Amino acid sequence: MVKDILAPGLRVVFCGINPGLSSANTGFPFAHPANRFWKVIHLAGFTDRQLKPEEAEKLLDFRCGVTKLVDRPTVQATEVKLHGLRSGGRNLIEKIEDYQPAALAVLGKQAFEQGFSQRGIAWGKQKIAIGATMVWVLPNPSGLNRIKTEKLVEAYRELDQALIMRGL
């Protein structure tokens, strides 16, 4: 089981789609060696060094958190069913209402659209908010995603810069 890493007062909560098998086996988020999450958040400015999956709790030191839309692990996120994403979206809203981070970053456009019943969204900051929490959609850092690491870093850095501009 991969547990959430959440606390009040966070700058951002990164929301993955669901745990992969590596994460399910280790209990750490974004644990597959091909997953670029830890590298990308470091290069984008969220952490001062590249953390390892087993150091996930240290995200709190950087006022960052991690959660997921769906608890059930799969080999690929495409195996997650629509009803699981919709239910996960409702649960995620409750978590965000409880913790109220400055931003929620959902990592995947299709997962966001399905989990939040949205259509035709663009990358970046969304029009919707959850209370005072800005909602962003960023590309998923999975190694299965073909987007280049530089583009991932650019997208994540845009969020980091938006938070800095708000004094966070």
UniProtKB/Swiss-Prot annotation:
This is G/U mismatch-specific DNA glycosylase. One of its GO terms (molecular function) is pyrimidine-specific mismatch base pair DNA N-glycosylase activity. Keywords: Cytoplasm, DNA damage, DNA excision, DNA repair, DNA-binding, Hydrolase. It is found in: Cytoplasm. PANTHER family: G/T AND G/U MISMATCH-SPECIFIC DNA GLYCOSYLASE, G_T MISMATCH-SPECIFIC THYMINE DNA GLYCOSYLASE. Excises ethenocytosine and uracil, which can arise by alkylation or deamination of cytosine, respectively, from the corresponding mispairs with guanine in ds-DNA. It is capable of hydrolyzing the carbon-nitrogen bond between the sugar-phosphate backbone of the DNA and the mispaired base. The complementary strand guanine functions in substrate recognition. Required for DNA damage lesion repair in stationary-phase cells. Belongs to the uracil-DNA glycosylase (UDG) superfamily. TDG/mug family.
